Swiss-Prot record:
<feature type="binding site">
    <location>
        <position position="709"/>
    </location>
    <ligand>
        <name>ATP 2</name>
    </ligand>
</feature>
<feature type="binding site">
    <location>
        <position position="242"/>
    </location>
    <ligand>
        <name>ATP 1</name>
    </ligand>
</feature>
<dbReference type="InterPro" id="IPR005479">
    <property type="entry name" value="CbamoylP_synth_lsu-like_ATP-bd"/>
</dbReference>
<comment type="pathway">
    <text>Pyrimidine metabolism; UMP biosynthesis via de novo pathway; (S)-dihydroorotate from bicarbonate: step 1/3.</text>
</comment>
<feature type="binding site">
    <location>
        <position position="823"/>
    </location>
    <ligand>
        <name>Mg(2+) 3</name>
    </ligand>
</feature>
<feature type="binding site">
    <location>
        <position position="169"/>
    </location>
    <ligand>
        <name>ATP 1</name>
    </ligand>
</feature>
<dbReference type="GO" id="GO:0005737">
    <property type="term" value="C:cytoplasm"/>
</dbReference>
<comment type="function">
    <text>Large subunit of the glutamine-dependent carbamoyl phosphate synthetase (CPSase). CPSase catalyzes the formation of carbamoyl phosphate from the ammonia moiety of glutamine, carbonate, and phosphate donated by ATP, constituting the first step of 2 biosynthetic pathways, one leading to arginine and/or urea and the other to pyrimidine nucleotides.</text>
</comment>
<dbReference type="GO" id="GO:0004087">
    <property type="term" value="F:carbamoyl-phosphate synthase (ammonia) activity"/>
</dbReference>
<dbReference type="Pfam" id="PF02142">
    <property type="entry name" value="MGS"/>
</dbReference>
<feature type="binding site">
    <location>
        <position position="285"/>
    </location>
    <ligand>
        <name>Mn(2+) 1</name>
    </ligand>
</feature>
<feature type="binding site">
    <location>
        <position position="748"/>
    </location>
    <ligand>
        <name>ATP 2</name>
    </ligand>
</feature>
<keyword id="KW-0460">Magnesium</keyword>
<feature type="binding site">
    <location>
        <position position="299"/>
    </location>
    <ligand>
        <name>Mg(2+) 1</name>
    </ligand>
</feature>
<dbReference type="Pfam" id="PF02786">
    <property type="entry name" value="CPSase_L_D2"/>
</dbReference>
<dbReference type="GO" id="GO:0046872">
    <property type="term" value="F:metal ion binding"/>
</dbReference>
<feature type="binding site">
    <location>
        <position position="215"/>
    </location>
    <ligand>
        <name>ATP 1</name>
    </ligand>
</feature>
């Protein structure tokens, strides 16, 4: 069937900010869809609130709106652009829910807009648990025994029928949000209450437990002519009970017989037909009873998903691109497979001759109060994928790709006595505990009995533990070529072998090199080598023939960001992509190295050559040996590649851009202090300490309060503000790695200072300011968690000019070539330098979207020797509108975790708001972040003594908008003395009715709550913040945030929608 010619313009709804359950994979799918539809001549209109995405680059769509993804905003875009159709299946649950809202509110009918990719009925049938169950029964497939309910009484009645343990699944949510497994009535009531709040339809599925069953996924595509193929089968290492996003998964499925696979395959196709998915990809999840072989359907997603991205990267089949083509009428037989050079049709079912492992990356270290047990609610923040010829090789490569300090099956960090608990109630280290169990002489049968992990997987790990024991009992010289080759085939890294042999990694490498025991590289070709591939999409293994076939062109290698932990998110993938694209255009052959399957950087056509490998020294050096690049870029992937810089230089690798020595000069406290002294620039008083005694002495020299943190960090891990010697002593005794090589940094904390971020770019001769951003939250809140405005909304021009002068001076002094970020604090009109990062940082995408200057592209060209003048980049662009970046937090996923912001970064993503005023931009950023301010109600204020003066303006602003003001007694007295009419409210310990009751009763529209550093004050007010979080009431733990929201609320009835292209067009005309 040819493409539809009745459609001229198509609106794609993106997924919004990166949150747990919905990450970079939708940037990958959305970017593919934009490219596919534009190639076919359609006008593409895009809406997405996330500025850190590739899909929101102005070149990706004809018209791009970085606006909140809510039906009211999208209606304004539809009214302005008049698209013929909407494609909602590339934006995860966010986009599907928005599409259903548009339909339910009559917008689609009003503007005669068609849903393509999935019909409203297909979405509803797949997402509504009751309808889905009926559909499965109709085609003879079983589902777990379940009942859906809309009230707590209905839920209790349903639970009595299904028994304990009980699975609670809210409807129309992502990543299992709000759900869980209950083993008793108290847990059941708590999860149901949370689940009802999470479901937009206030609906729960109360389901029979199938804990311990094996879990499988089938990634399926289907077109309107009923052509269907299975792209990939995926098996979960973890049994049912762990969310598939958190589970270790392998592809293809390893423990199914052919007969079982064919049954599951046929069932998957039947599910798509019955649900009505006929223009795209879907993910169907099954559970299989390991004892009886009974198979049931768990759920399906009628859209591209996290598993779609994994299946695409695992096989090379571009699911999102093909799904976009089907949405406009193409059929499977009409499309060709790009990865085989279009030699094969897209209808050729992929087959693979390697094993793929996906492992999730967690961030529980950021949320110490969170429950780290893995359940049906997703908790991971990122993931890695590894490929190998054996599952053991694949497992071990995935472990070392996680960026958690592992180089294989390192011993788990918990006590021996916890083995049984860790196997029975899995946490983030459960695979290591399987290894630990084998080391402790558990039998495979015992481990299977406790963990329900399939015996075949256990046999693979048992064999690896036997190999480790054999290695550790010998010496390096005992390992001949055959023994080393066997170990490398099983995925053992040089570093892990070195640990087992008590030698250095270098010694192991030097044992391999003379006998030419090097990895070879094999292509991902979708056909298990049946057809030749023209794309260089490669993974390493230890076999005979290398199929990499490197060219003799001038090459630049870009090291990516890995699994995107908190502090190193999608922004760094954006920068990596923006290094590859301009360098390709400039004639270089680009080589990307990364291990994250969710990203655009690991799309096979982003760079000339893609190596899907862990970002470790060993793996990178082997690729360098194979490719012999002219230069390597370590500055765009965050701390992950930056940590390798010195070791790469020591091994003769040419790091282009800012030198490794200059990076060290900026990161090393003593060297950087000398740079600032030479330039006459100020820093807050600071010292370096290598142990507790030295820290206490030097802290007295500086004075309290202090910011303390380890050196060489990203995302502020282990960063705190301490107000006393006792607090510093406690910090030093926590598990923070402090030594001569890794000292702790002590900085005097500047109270009530304004923090400022500056991005700039240099070619080594000239420096251009990219943008100056004023933080909303005061200094002391991690810059990644603070809102920020470009241009600044209250800094004087004189201060901004001084910041420009200091930034350029530091860039010249450090010999900057490429990008640099500087963080300043301004206190009483005095500018202090906080830190300098001579690399790409998380603000680069935001600045680029706000100003139209493609900073990452410009910086990459500078590294390759192309001057700023040659690129036509000679002056700063200052917009005549405001752009506000706001952070998005995962607190709702971690009940009990306090929402107070501090120096340690905890946000997972970001959004951007654009407006004619700072208030409008800030308010839109809050909407994009999911905050919804009720038009009526009361504003609750409870602030510490030093914040009371500042909160007066906030109270007056909200009162002028018609809100009641209800402070706690101390704040109420202060506001009354300053002429405000308020109604005091009790704190929770002061008697009822109290603030907790008011929040539950829906009386409170917004909370502003600041507390002193005193632990008792934090503890006493914790219940207020938790209640606000549970009731989805906007809350601000800084007075600056509350004040900004009070300014923003003035604009709520006058919000416009602005395309990136029209904003950038205005800037070009001005400049």
């Amino acid at each position: 069937m040819p493409k539809r010619t009745d459609l001229k313009s198509i609106l794609i709804i993106g997924a919004g900010p990166i949150v747990i359950g919905q990450a970079c994979e939708f940037d990958y799918s959305g970017a593919q869809a934009c490219k596919a539809l534009r190639e076919e001549g359609y006008k593409v209109i895009l809406v997405n609130s996330n500025p850190a995405t590739i899909m929101t680059d102005p070149e990706m769509a004809d018209v791009t709106y970085i606006e909140p993804i809510m039906w009211q905003t999208v209606e304004k875009i539809i009214a302005k652009e008049r698209p013929d159709a909407i494609l909602p299946t590339m934006g995860g649950q966010t986009x599907l829910n928005c599409a259903l809202d548009l339909a339910g509110n009559g917008v689609l009918a009003k503007y005669d807009v068609e849903l393509i990719g999935a019909t409203e009925d297909a979405i509803d049938k797949a997402e509504d648990p009751g309808r889905f169950k009926e559909a499965m029964e109709k085609i003879g497939l079983s589902c777990p025994k379940s009942l859906f309910c809309h009230t707590m009484n209905e839920a209790l009645a349903a639970q009595e029928q299904v028994g304990f343990p009980t699975l609670i699944r809210p409807s129309f949510t992502m990543g299992g949000s709000g759900g869980g497994i209950a083993y008793n009535k108290d847990e059941f009531l708590a999860i149901c209450e949370r689940g009802f709040d999470a479901s937009p339809t206030h609906e729960l599925l109360i389901e029979q437990s199938v804990l311990g069953w094996k879990e499988y996924e089938m990634e399926v595509v289907r077109d309107k002519a009923d052509n269907c193929i299975i792209i990939c089968s995926i098996e979960n290492f973890d049994p049912m009970g762990v969310h598939t996003g958190d589970s270790i998964t392998v592809a293809p499925a390893e423990t199914l017989t052919d007969k079982e696979y064919q049954i599951m395959r046929n069932a998957s196709l039947a599910v798509l037909r019955e649900i009505g998915v006929d223009t795209g990809g879907s993910n169907v999840q099954f559970a299989v009873n390991p004892e009886k072989g009974e198979m049931i359907v768990i759920e399906m997603n009628p859209r591209v998903s996290r598993s779609s991205a994994l299946a695409s990267k695992a096989t090379g089949f571009p699911i999102a691109k093909v799904a976009a083509n089907w949405a406009v009428g193409f059929t499977l037989d009409e499309l060709r497979n790009d990865i085989t050079g279009r030699r094969t049709p897209a209808s050729f079912e992929p087959s693979i001759d390697y094993v793929v492992t996906k492992m999730a990356r967690f961030a529980f270290e950021k949320f110490p109060a969170a429950d780290d047990r893995l359940t049906t609610q997703m908790k991971s923040v990122g993931e890695v994928m590894a490929m190998g010829r054996t599952i053991q090789e694949s497992f071990q490569k995935a472990l070392r790709g996680l960026e958690t300090g592992l180089c294989g099956f390192n011993p788990a960090r918990r006590r021996q006595t916890e083995i049984r608990r860790e196997l029975a109630n899995p946490g983030p280290e459960r695979m290591l505990f399987v290894g630990k169990a084998f080391r402790a002489a558990f039998t495979p049968e015992e481990i299977h009995e406790i963990s329900a992990i399939d015996p075949w997987f256990l046999a693979q790990i048992e064999d690896l533990m036997k190999e480790e024991k054999s290695v550790s009992d010998g010496q390096l010289q005992d390992l001949d070529y055959a023994a080393l080759h066997r170990l490398k085939r099983k995925g053992f890294s040089d570093k892990r072998l070195a640990q087992l042999l008590n030698v250095s990694e270098k010694e192991v490498r030097e044992t391999r090199t003379p006998v030419k025991l090097d990895p070879v590289y094999k292509p991902v070709d979708t056909s298990a080598a049946e057809f030749a591939t023209e794309t260089a999409y490669l993974y390493s293994t230890y076999e005979e023939e290398c199929e990499s076939r490197p060219s003799d062109r001038k090459k630049v290698m870009i090291l990516g960001a890995g699994p995107n932990p908190i502090g190193q998110g999608i922004e760094f993938d954006y920068c990596s992509v923006h290094a590859a694209l301009p360098l390709r255009e400039s004639g270089f052959e680009t080589i990307m190295v990364n291990c994250n399957p969710e990203t655009v950087s690991t799309d096979f056509d982003t760079s000339d050559r893609l190596y899907f490998e862990p970002l470790t020294l060993e793996d990178v050096l082997e690729i360098v040996r194979t490719e012999n690049p002219w230069g390597v870029i370590v500055h765009y992937g965050g701390q992950t590649p930056l940590k390798l810089a010195n070791a790469l230089v020591e091994n003769g690798v040419n790091i282009i851009g800012t030198s490794a020595d200059s990076i060290d000069a900026a990161e090393d406290r003593e060297r950087f202090q000398k740079v600032l002294n030479d330039l006459g620039l100020r820093q807050p008083p600071n010292r370096i300490a290598h142990n507790e005694e030295e820290a206490l002495v030097k802290a007295e020299e500086i004075g309290y309060p202090l910011v303390v943190r380890p050196s060489y960090v990203l995302g502020g891990p282990a960063m705190q503000i301490v107000h006393s010697a006792e607090a510093l002593q406690k910090y030093m005794r926590e598990p923070v790695q402090v030594s001569e090589d890794s000292p702790v940094l002590l900085d005097f904390f500047l109270n009530n200072a304004i923090e400022v971020d500056v991005d700039c770019v240099s070619d080594g001769k000239d420096v251009v300011i990219g943008g100056i951003m004023q933080h909303v939250e005061q200094a002391g809140i991690h810059s990644g968690d603070s809102g920020c405005s470009l241009p600044p909304y209250s800094l004087s021009e004189e201060i901004q000019d001084e910041i420009r002068r200091q930034t350029k001076a530091m860039a010249y002094a450090l010999g900057l070539v490429g990008l640099m970020n500087v963080q300043f604090a301004v206190q009483d009109a005095v500018v202090f330098v906080l830190e300098v990062n001579p690399r790409a940082t998380r603000t680069v995408p935001f600045v680029s979207k706000a100003t139209g200057q493609r900073l990452a592209k410009v910086g990459a060209r500078c590294m390759a020797g192309i001057s700023l003048k040659e690129q036509g980049v000679e002056k700063e662009v200052v917009p005549d509108f405001y752009a506000v970046k706001e952070a998005v937090f995962p607190f709702i996923k971690f009940p009990g975790v306090d929402t107070i912001l501090n120096p340690e970064m905890r946000s997972t993503g970001e959004v951007m708001g654009v407006g004619r005023s700072f208030g409008e931009a800030y308010y839109k950023a809050q909407l994009g972040a999911g905050e919804r301010l009720n038009p009526t109600g009361k504003i609750f204020l409870s602030v510490r003594e030093e914040d009371k003066e500042r909160v007066i303006k906030t109270a007056k602003n909200f009162q002028a908008l018609g809100y009641g003001i209800c402070p706690t007694r101390g704040t109420a007295q202060y506001l009354t003395e300053h002429g405000l009419i308020v109604q005091a409210i009790n704190k929770v310990p002061e008697g009822r009715p109290h603030i907790g009751d008011a929040l539950k009763n829906g009386e409170i529209a917004l909370v502003v709550n600041t507390v002193s550093s005193d632990p008792q004050s934090v503890s006493d007010s914790h219940i207020i913040r938790q209640s606000a979080l549970q009731q989805r009431v906007p809350q601000y733990t800084t007075t600056a945030g509350g004040e900004a929201m009070s300014e923003g609320a003035k604009s709520r009835d006058y919000l416009g929608v602005y395309s990136v292209q029209e904003l950038h067009g205005r800037l070009k005309n001005r400049n």
